[in-house]
Amino acid sequence: MTFALFQWGLVWGGMFTGPYNLTPFPSIHDRLALFQGLRALLPVAAAYIALLWALAARARFRFGLTTPGLLTYYGALGLASSIVLSPDTPTAIYWSSAFLAPLLAAWFVIERPEPLPVLRAFLRVNNAIIVFLMLAVLPEAARFGFGQATRFEVYRMPFGLGEVRANGVGRYALVVLIVAFVSLVASPSKKRLLWLPLTVPALFILMQTQSRSALLGLAVASMLFVLVRGVSLRFLIAGPVAAYAIWLSGFTWRAKGELGSLVFLTGRETTWAKGLAKIGESPVLGWGFHADRILLDSEHMHNSYLHAAIQAGIPGALLFAAAVAVLWAFLWRSGVLRRVRRAAPPDQELLIQSVLLLGFLSARSFFESTAAFYGVDLLLFVPAVCYIYQWALENPAAEP
């Protein structure tokens, strides 16, 4: 397990940096710049180590047509496009390698004799990192306070980690709320009470950011919780709080009481039109990873499926869409959604957290580029998916 966790640390190590911090190569006298630049190499190192292991062990690729498998095929196609068609080949190859790193790390774990405990550890590491990220922006959030304009704020991260916009910060807050609420409800340990103090700053930040994708995720996660766990006294208390947060932050502050403002795309349609034009110029292979930033004057696609298409063409977009569709078909057909409430600790808690998290990220994929490139969303998505698949494999549904 130790080496697998080390490898997962390498995958996370490249977050909030990139090859731009290596050009020009930082001076050895500027330790922070050197640290940021060298961190950019860590996900690529993780992918390289996993490939060396696969070749040495002659490992069989067991993901097949599962969600991790389809995402890997999408990443491989994007890597080929990066090599052949990208206007900035080195940058595109870097980001495609970084995208494949968590999938290759998960493959390494799945091939171990007992993968489930390692995947549990990955989920707990992810939870700890998201809590850290939320607390890291809390001083900025406290400085901004409440107001209708807070959704335009940019939150500065400590330690030279850069800046995060309100949508990204809202995502941190919602993930903390999901993990905290499920732990308080499903965990038998008294340590679950440690999550209670975190719910207050998480709810404060979620409402402050007025992030529509995060508020939508809160609604989706709430419905999924009722589906997998049923209505309980705790939910009857938390449900109205969630509804009030959505109404106040989303409808009253963000939309100013007008439903039309709530569904306004804030310029996304212009970016989508530019992206579609570029996709039309290379519909089969796309333009390689990071294509939106390279070809659209550093604009972001804000849609996972268009993001996949501009990077890996229409086939890549279909692979990505299939990965999401196959996931939810598997959750339903395998009975995981029905069997979660009967799972033994600690799996019940982690399964519910994973299902709710995947519901949020799936809903977010229509308005943000969730899991279509190397980023926080991808590193949350991959372990949650692999954990659910592995648990279902080790705990098959009883024959009717």
Predicted regions and their residues:
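Hydrophobic, aromatic-rich transmembrane alpha-helices
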Residues: 1, 8, 43-60, 175-186, ...
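N-terminal signal-anchor transmembrane segment
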Residues: 1-57, 77-85, 136, 361-364, ...
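Long extracytoplasmic/lumenal interhelical loops at the membrane interface
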Residues: 25, 253-315, 331-342
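Hydrophobic transmembrane alpha-helices and their immediate junctions
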Residues: 59, 65, 191, 314-362, ...
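Aromatic-anchored transmembrane helix interface
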Residues: 67-79, 87-111, 121-134
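Alpha-helical transmembrane segments of multi-pass inner-membrane proteins
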Residues: 120-150, 164-228, 329-333
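A membrane-periplasm/extracellular boundary helix in multi-pass inner-membrane enzymes
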Residues: 135-143, 226-265, 273-281
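Transmembrane alpha-helices of multi-pass inner-membrane enzymes
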Residues: 236, 355-364, 369-400
